[in-house]
Amino acid sequence: MNYLVNYCKISFYFLMSISLSLFLISLKFLLMDLVYFIEWEILSLQSMSIVMTFLFDWMSLMFMSFVLLISSLVIFYSNQYMEEDYNINRFILLVLMFVMSMMMLIISPNLISILLGWDGLGLVSYCLVIYFQNVKSYNAGMLTALSNRIGDVALLLAIAWMLNYGSWNYIFYLDMMKNNIEMMIIGGLVMLAAMTKSAQIPFSSWLPAAMAAPTPVSALVHSSTLVTAGVYLLIRFNDVLMNWWMAQFLLLVSGLTMFMAGLGANFEFDLKKIIALSTLSQLGLMMSILSMGFYKLAFFHLLTHALFKALLFMCAGSIIHNMKNSQDIRMMGSLSMSMPLTCSCFNVANLALCGMPFLAGFYSKDLILEMVMLSYVNVFSFFL
């Protein structure tokens, strides 16, 4: 067991140190307005070449640092939360595979390498959802996998359409050809892929179902990293969303998702599903502000939301663990007396989610409201 504990701790210290260094580097990139584009050729066949490309700018480095920070804390949390599990070694390896897939997605300006990270996320999340290997987990895992397949097919079709341009490095073509019909089709396909991964209507059923996974997985995968991959992809493709019909369609869908998730959470008794539905409403908020053209604001809310939602899930995991694995909120009472520290952290995260002044959620949500009020589409959104 000591070997496994050390394995967890090594992963924790390694990921945490990389996270802090990447955060400092991203601040330097932001202040100096630096962008590094690294490309090398893997294979060349006559006029066709396969190249591996990485894009390092402040946005990708900062998002990577946040993903690594939450991953390291989740691994540290799993050290004791899952210490009775025989397969904790396999669990940590799956989490590390997930982090690698997420890194691949974040730093790729190339649709093919994005697909590698995208499919890696889908596969590893399926393995993590079915981790407990019972009928409920298998059903939830299949629903998760099949819902995400639609987005994978849309991304493959976008790769096929990119052949019209002669390269898959979409970042070169977004600004120049954003009014072309081909780029509109590619943008529509990317938007469909992002809607499946970020669980917008009509693909939102898989996110509450994926709560069959262990709680550390919910804290990492289904709150802060996997579900925000779709939002991050749309942030990268934000020039294509300047098309008015795409933006209005996305605004309508995300508004409906917010409404549906908020309404559904009122009638739910499962603690983890309530938090999952709040994640869904926050994803709807990110998508709606993205459709109005404020992509940096969507990124800011993505970062703040990741932190307090991971804390919410970890506190929920602690409560469920002490309730002898019962997730029914009707069975919980007087928790503030028996678990004061956990309840304090839970309430802090809850107030941040509500937008309490001077907590993380306040800064992003207040900015979002201010920008929407001052925006020219505010009449449409108010009527919505």
Curated annotation (Swiss-Prot):
GO terms for biological process: ATP synthesis coupled electron transport; electron transport coupled proton transport. It is an enzyme of class 7 (translocase). The keyword Translocase applies. It catalyses: a ubiquinone + NADH + 5 H(+)(in) = a ubiquinol + NAD(+) + 4 H(+)(out). Keywords: Electron transport, Membrane, Mitochondrion, Mitochondrion inner membrane, NAD, Respiratory chain, Translocase, Transmembrane, Transmembrane helix, Transport, Ubiquinone. Its EC number is 7.1.1.2. InterPro entries: ND/Mrp_TM (IPR001750), NU5C-like (IPR003945), Proton_antipo_N (IPR001516). It comes from the Eukaryota. The chain crosses the membrane at residues 12-32, 50-70, 92-112, 113-133, 153-173, 183-203, 215-235, 244-264, 274-293, 298-320, 343-363, 364-384. Belongs to the complex I subunit 5 family. This is NADH-ubiquinone oxidoreductase chain 5. It comes from Anopheles arabiensis.
